[in-house]
């Protein structure tokens, strides 16, 4: 049995992005390309959309981020997974953004900054209702 196929028409995708950008103004768009662009080819889609240098590509892991960077994508890349101390240097060296979703993440980043004098760019993740990941708006301490 042959399964369904999805085809991405690059020029239509580009036009859709341009329409969205015209409506949101100067707000940067985050394009989710984790899990190999949900099967559509993360590197292919990211390289095609990297004409807009303000476009931010989002992946799950440091490995996915490295695949994009090594494939020639120079745009900002955000890593969704929890911060792992063993890859923070690599994230900093490749100008990746890390996802800080818990107080422990910020404590680790502060420790890294105090010991090395640098840390990667940070994206603060707030729980918006799914109660899976992110700071709770109700917590103020």
Show which residues each predicted segment covers:
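Active-site-proximal beta-alpha core segment in soluble small-molecule metabolic enzymes
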Residues: 4-8, 12, 24-141
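Alpha-helical packing segments of well-folded alpha/beta enzyme cores
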Residues: 13-16, 20
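Gly-rich Lys/Arg/Thr-decorated short loops/hinges at beta-loop-alpha junctions or inter-strand turns
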Residues: 1
